């Protein structure tokens, strides 16, 4: 049973700072840093739109009403918010929604100064851990959890847009008749093997570094990677590399982890505990604007893909991504993202039970050193819970 009103262990401490800011903006003698109660009982205050959350009711956003001036000031205090994409400006979940939101002025409308920077998922984790950037796009929840351990970092997933795995193992035609034939071979990877593929192989008794090797491949061109003689294949996104190979008429065999009973996720938007604690309204409103961008992108996939293509071209398109490829990519991903959304589980809302199953099953077959990670501090569904109304619509102030 899904419970959207989650408890808030991560943000219990930030209500004090937010309450102080409200007082300072309202002319009260209290200023930021003044003594204040250690807790704020918002659950008992009439009119609180999200009882029990970390934001005092006076800062709540109400649909169709003016954006609170004190909240605007709090958001401006956050300064420039840097978002790092996970694959240049591709038309992909947790990237395209940010691009659409920016193109429509949604961040500006909520008093947010957002700097959108192209990058690659595995390069971003240390930067988010150090708070050198505040938001990023992760390949999957398990990828984020894995890097959290590697970086000893306080990552927090605020949205998980894809509730199934997006990655698969793409192998050369005729070279891998069954998964067992991966044994003793090399797989090309971009930084690291993707979690779902690693879990799929582990379930078949194939362990990285023992039964097969992984080697880094340069660039992002599957047409070049499929020709590398020393590897039998490489992980890729079902919405990307297979489409390019099919368009080029190159045969291949795809192993989809979901066909082997492997749970997964994709399109993760995450931040760090430091930023979330210091700037709770800015963090929530970044997600509010982004989820509105996601709703627009799902409603009109072709128009959203064109936004991504325009941004790619304006920034030099370093990966030479094609308009046709990006349109095809988002056509696949938008369907995967939207088909699991309901009023109780709207677009992007992290489903903690499902994520727990994901990391637990991965641990049982050897990932995370065989120990299921504790994810309570690594995901916070309450942030998006406060962004959506009971119909699953983003709560948006008057223009």
Label every PLM stretch briefly.
Residues 279-368:
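Secondary-structure end/capping motifs
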Residues 20-24:
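C-terminal motif of bacterial Sec signal peptides marking the signal peptidase cleavage site
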Residues 25-35:
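Bacterial lipoprotein signal-peptidase II cleavage site
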Residues 55-58, 352-399:
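Conserved C-terminal helix/tail region of periplasmic/extracytoplasmic solute-binding proteins
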Residues 1-11:
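Bacterial N-terminal signal peptides that target proteins for export
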Residues 40, 45, 52-232, 236, ...:
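Short, glycine-/small- and polar/acidic-enriched structural segments
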Residues 116-117, 155-157, 214, 256, ...:
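Surface-exposed patches in mature extracellular/periplasmic domains of secreted proteins
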Residues 222-223, 227-319:
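Pocket-lining segment of extracytoplasmic ligand-binding domains
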């Amino acid at each position: 049973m899904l419970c959207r009103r989650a408890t808030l262990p991560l943000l219990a401490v930030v209500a004090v700072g937010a309450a102080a800011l409200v007082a300072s903006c309202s002319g009260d003698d209290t200023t930021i840093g003044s003594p204040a109660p250690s807790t704020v009982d918002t659950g008992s205050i009439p009119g609180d739109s999200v009882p029990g959350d970390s934001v005092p009711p006076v800062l709540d956003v109400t649909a169709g009403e003016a954006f609170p001036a004190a909240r605007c000031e709090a958001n401006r205090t956050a300064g420039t918010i840097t978002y790092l994409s996970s694959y240049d400006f591709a038309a992909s979940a947790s990237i395209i929604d940010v691009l659409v939101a920016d193109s429509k002025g949604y961040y500006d409308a909520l008093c947010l100064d957002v700097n959108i920077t192209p990058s690659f998922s595995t390069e971003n984790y240390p930067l988010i851990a150090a708070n050198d950037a505040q938001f990023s796009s992760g390949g999957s929840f398990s990828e984020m959890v894995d890097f959290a351990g590697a970086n000893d970092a306080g990552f927090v997933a605020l949205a998980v847009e894809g509730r199934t795995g997006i990655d698969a193992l793409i192998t050369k035609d005729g070279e891998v008749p069954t998964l067992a034939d991966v044994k003793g071979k090399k797989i090309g990877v971009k930084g690291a093997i993707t979690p779902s593929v690693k879990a799929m192989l582990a379930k078949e008794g194939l362990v990285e570094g023992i039964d097969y090797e992984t080697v880094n491949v340069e660039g992002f061109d599957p047409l070049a990677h499929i020709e590398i003689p020393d590897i039998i294949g490489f992980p890729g996104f079902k919405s990307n590399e297979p489409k390019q190979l099919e368009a080029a008429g190159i045969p291949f065999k795809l192993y989809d982890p979901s066909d082997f009973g492997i749970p997964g996720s994709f399109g993760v938007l995450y931040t760090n505990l430091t930023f979330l604690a210091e700037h709770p309204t800015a963090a929530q409103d970044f997600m509010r604007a982004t989820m509105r961008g996601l709703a627009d992108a799902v409603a009109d996939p072709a128009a959203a893909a064109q936004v991504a293509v325009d941004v790619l071209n304006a920034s030099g398109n370093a990966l030479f991504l094609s308009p046709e490829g990006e349109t095809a990519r988002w056509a696949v991903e938008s369907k995967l993202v939207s088909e699991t959304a309901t009023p109780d589980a709207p677009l992007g809302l992290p489903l903690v039970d499902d994520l727990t199953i994901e990391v637990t099953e991965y641990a049982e077959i050897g990932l995370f050193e065989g120990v299921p990670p504790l994810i309570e501090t690594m995901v916070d569904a309450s942030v998006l819970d406060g962004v959506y109304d009971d119909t699953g619509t983003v709560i948006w102030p008057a223009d």
